[in-house]
């Protein structure tokens, strides 16, 4: 699974997922299913925001090839993928600027057009089950919930899907591709079956035991994406990189 993740996801996404797991004391080399799930969730969050802007009249528009002269503002602020301190700084700044109620839990996005935080979910189970779990945890009508599944199903608060159909179809296609790629490598069953995943986790732990006392080289390189607090993730370079990653995965 680890090899699959590194092959089929953009390196920036992989780096952010590793950083998030290490922040909670988790090892991507051992908890590989969680590693894959975090990368998938990150990519969906990025794809959700791609190409969506607000013009000078505060109208929502979709722009795939950016006009440098256009007065555009990113419609979505991505909170997911930042370290917790920076993420809460962004949330507090948004709340102070817009007057929106501060959420109890870190959301994934903020929608400047609808003035609401968004919680994105990607599930391997039934969408309505996962939606209810999210709603019970958040316990706030102010945070909008949007759930996607690997089977093409989706569910959102009050059936308000926020994005146009084409943008949502792009996300569903990517999730279906990830599922097909996992299945072709014999990884899908363990990804969706907790019992099989637990067996694989034990196997991973056992394979690492002889190396437990070996020194580990740690990289202190910081992702360029984490060096700024201004709205990001939607630039053409990142979009091109994600597309390249998507096409690479498709051709396998």
UniProtKB/Swiss-Prot annotation:
InterPro entries assigned to the protein according to its UniProt record, in alphabetical order: PA/PA-X, PA/PA-X_sf
Keyword annotations from UniProtKB, A to Z: Decay of host mRNAs by virus, Eukaryotic host gene expression shutoff by virus, Host cytoplasm, Host gene expression shutoff by virus, Host mRNA suppression by virus, Host nucleus, Host-virus interaction
One example GO MF annotation: RNA binding
UniProt keyword annotation of Cytoplasm present: no
Gene3D superfamilies linked: Influenza RNA-dependent RNA polymerase subunit PA, endonuclease domain (3.40.91.90)
Pfam families linked: Flu_PA
UniProt protein name: Protein PA-X
Organism: Influenza A virus (strain A/Goose/Guangxi/345/2005 H5N1 genotype G)
Gene this protein is translated from: PA
């Amino acid at each position: 699974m680890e090899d699959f993740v590194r092959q089929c996801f953009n390196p920036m996404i992989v780096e952010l997922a590793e950083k998030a797991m290490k922040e909670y004391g988790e090892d991507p080399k051992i908890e590989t299913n969680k590693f894959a799930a975090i990368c998938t969730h990150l990519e969906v969050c990025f794809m959700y925001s791609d190409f969506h802007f607000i013009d000078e009249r505060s109208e929502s528009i979709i722009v795939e090839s950016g006009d440098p002269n256009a007065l555009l503002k990113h419609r979505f602020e991505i909170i997911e993928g930042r370290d917790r301190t920076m993420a809460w700084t962004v949330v507090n700044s948004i709340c102070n600027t817009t007057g929106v109620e501060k959420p109890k839990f870190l959301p994934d996005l903020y929608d400047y057009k609808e003035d609401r935080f968004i919680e994105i979910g990607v599930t391997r189970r039934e969408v309505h089950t996962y939606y209810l779990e999210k709603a019970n945890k958040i316990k706030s009508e102010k945070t909008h919930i949007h759930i996607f599944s690997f089977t093409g199903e989706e569910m959102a608060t009050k059936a308000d899907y926020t994005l146009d159909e084409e943008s949502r179809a792009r996300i569903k296609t990517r999730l279906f591709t990830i599922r097909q790629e996992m299945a072709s490598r014999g990884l899908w069953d363990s990804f969706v079956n907790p019992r099989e995943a637990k067996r694989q986790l034990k196997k991973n732990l056992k394979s690492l035991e002889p190396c437990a006392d070996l020194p580990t080289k740690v990289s202190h390189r910081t992702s360029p994406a984490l060096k700024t607090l201004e709205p990001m993730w939607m630039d053409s370079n990142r979009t091109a990189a994600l597309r390249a990653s998507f096409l690479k995965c498709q051709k396998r």
